[in-house]
Amino acid sequence: MSAQGKLEEWEINKYWDIFSGLKPVNNVLTGDQVSPVLKNSNLSEDKLAKIWDLADVDSDGCLDFEEFCITMRLIFDLLNNNINDVPSTLPQWLVPQSKAHLIEANKAISQPHSKLDDSDDEDLENLGLSTDFDWYISPADRDSYSAIFTANCDRHGRVSYDALTELYQTLSRVPEGDIAMAWNLVNPKSDERIEKEQCLVFLHMLNYREKGVRIPRGVPASLRATFEKATPEFSINSSQAELKPQKSNAPASKKEAFANGYLQKLGIGGNSYSTSGTDFSATKDTDWEEVRLKRELTDLENLVEKAERAAADSKQHGNSYSTSHTALIKRELEQLLDYKEEQLRKAKSGAPASVGETNLKESEEEVNLLEMQVNELEVHQQRKQQELDQLEAELASLRK
């Protein structure tokens, strides 16, 4: 008999024999594959459905080996009268370590959701939360977020949800449910640990929530694709597809830096934080700045060329929305190109540049954002062309 409150090694080996015997595909079993095993238990359909819901932790409609172990243990506990009924929640001892963070996050998200009909809407209004969330991460914020990440990441450059527990405790205006919600947004694959870019966006959400801005309901398609490491599916009509840097209305001097006390506790300091590595952007007495700016100019010129081609295609196919949006992006690219050309002129003439002008990270972010916009436009144009081709084909068939 299985020990109550523990999965024995022999038990796991037995479940593995059953699991592998069902011939999993991509290390998971579908409902059809598991169905014979479930029905052989002679448990009621209602109980089997509850067991499935508990075991399918990531809600993907399939069971991996860990989830299969949960299923089998619950079935055997019922058959052996170790438990009288299917538990309403998964027992803590039965939660796989790799999925513990997902269980907690799902609890945190489902809990406030169940209260929306009662008082959560009122509570949110009383809190006076704003919806003015800005995805753009300023260089100063990026430095702070990077410091937190570096202090807590493992040797593989990844950080777990629990590793930031001390940080969460310093956030007086961020409830636990919102922390879990932000974590789920940057971690669509429900990994136990996340990488640096995911962590920076996660901290950015917490920063805004601490300042009284609600956690967004979703992430832009370009970010989501990065987090999933998959080919992006952009929707240019979505308001979330825009990733433009915006200036906050509140003066920076009147805002306390995010996690300032936590950074000081780490021995880094909040507002005074600076990277200890070599800052090449401060090298003004060499040819480095000129070389860097020339490279940026080349990248921007290529982006402008891509935007012009997309605009020409849109005009040719008569898509007024795409044409206007392309023109807008083209203007933004040209303005940034003019700005970079002015930087290069100053560098050649020896004129001093401001710290912001020589910040390589900021320039790279701007170029990346513009590249995202151009890519979105190209994908959108392709879709519109497909729609046009389909309509023309339908019209042709009607004329016959």
From Swiss-Prot:
It holds the Pfam family End3. Residues 344-364 are annotated as: Disordered. It is found in: Cell membrane; Endosome membrane; Cytoplasm, Cytoskeleton, Actin patch. It is a peripheral membrane protein. GO terms for molecular function: actin binding; calcium ion binding. GO terms for cellular component: actin cortical patch; cytoplasm; endosome membrane; plasma membrane. CDD domains: EH. Keywords: Actin-binding, Calcium, Cell membrane, Coiled coil, Cytoplasm, Cytoskeleton, Endocytosis, Endosome, Membrane, Metal-binding, Repeat. Residues 11-101, 141-230 form the EH domain. Belongs to the END3 family. Component of the PAN1 actin cytoskeleton-regulatory complex required for the internalization of endosomes during actin-coupled endocytosis. The complex links the site of endocytosis to the cell membrane-associated actin cytoskeleton. Mediates uptake of external molecules and vacuolar degradation of plasma membrane proteins. Plays a role in the proper organization of the cell membrane-associated actin cytoskeleton and promotes its destabilization. PANTHER family: ACTIN CYTOSKELETON-REGULATORY COMPLEX PROTEIN END3, EH DOMAIN. This is Actin cytoskeleton-regulatory complex protein END3. It comes from Yarrowia lipolytica (strain CLIB 122 / E 150) (Yeast).
